[in-house]
Curated annotation (Swiss-Prot):
Single biological process term from Gene Ontology: import into nucleus
GO CC terms, sorted: mitochondrial outer membrane
Keywords: Membrane, Mitochondrion, Mitochondrion outer membrane, Transit peptide
Family (UniProt): Belongs to the FMP52 family.
Main location: mitochondrion
Official protein name in the record: Protein FMP52, mitochondrial
Location of the protein in the cell: Mitochondrion outer membrane
Membrane among keywords: yes
Tagged with keyword Ribosomal protein: no
Alphabetized InterPro entries for the sequence: NAD(P)-bd_dom, NAD(P)-bd_dom_sf
Taxonomic lineage from the root: Eukaryota, Fungi, Dikarya, Ascomycota, Saccharomycotina
Membrane-topology descriptor: Peripheral membrane protein
Pfam families, per database record: NAD_binding_10 (PF13460)
Length: 224
């Protein structure tokens, strides 16, 4: 079995790639990225495809994979505004998932967000909810929606996470504490990736659509 990872240079996507490439359940793990992968992610089972022309990524989606793991996302600041963020977080995810489905992919794992709701009055949560809705509508054999709380972790030597670095540092103080619910159950991106890969390969869970909350993600991440 082969998998494709989108967003593989990001916080959760890089963890998808890490755990999928280490898992014997996958023979090959493809990664389509805009920039080269870090050296530690270039293992024997990883097939790296680098292209800055994101409008052509659909053509690069391999036909011999059946599992899509996507952590493709950006921030409003990095994208230069909410409209551009929407084009990446929603439009790219949905369009690429649509191509993957047409090429025979059976499983889609999407990193969403705590509080995602297509009817939310908060633009970010509405964006995530609409992305979930449209991915589910593609009707994969199995769709797994991961809804982490505040994301913790480091990427490329810079502290990254939900909100600014100060919020992330505060969240880390509440990580797995009795007060974790007050900050939306913060979780490390590495844990999100670990759980996503595990659920993608778990044939014992037969639900067509699985929505996994941050508390459940934290619980599953503790399991070996």
């Amino acid at each position: 079995m082969n998998a494709l990872v989108l967003g593989a240079t990001g916080l959760c996507g890089s963890s998808f790639l890490k755990y999928a490439s280490q898992n014997s359940g996958f023979d090959k793990v493809y990664a389509i990225t805009r920039r080269d992968l870090p050296s530690e992610l270039k293992t024997d089972s990883v097939v790296s495809v680098v292209s800055s022309e994101t409008n052509k990524w659909g053509e690069l989606i391999p036909e011999d994979a059946t599992v899509l793991l996507t952590g493709l996302a950006t921030t409003r600041a990095a994208a230069g505004g909410f409209e551009n963020q929407y084009k990446i977080d929603h439009d790219m995810n949905v369009e690429l998932a649509k191509v993957a489905k047409a090429k025979g992919y059976k499983v889609c794992v999407l990193v969403s967000s705590l509080g995602a709701n297509e009817n939310s009055f908060l633009p970010y949560l509405k964006l995530k909810g609409e992305t979930e809705r449209d991915i589910i509508a593609l009707d994969f054999d199995k769709t797994i929606i991961l809804r982490p709380g505040g994301l913790l972790g480091e990427r490329n030597g810079t502290f990254k996470g939900f909100g600014d670095k100060y919020f992330s540092k505060i969240s880390s103080c509440f990580y797995r504490s009795k007060l974790q619910s007050a900050l939306g159950y913060p979780i490390y991106g590495d844990e999100v990736g670990k759980v996503g890969v595990k659920l993608a390969l778990d044939s014992s869970r037969t639900e067509k659509v699985q929505i996994v909350s941050s508390p459940e993600l934290l619980k599953l991440a503790e399991e070996k």
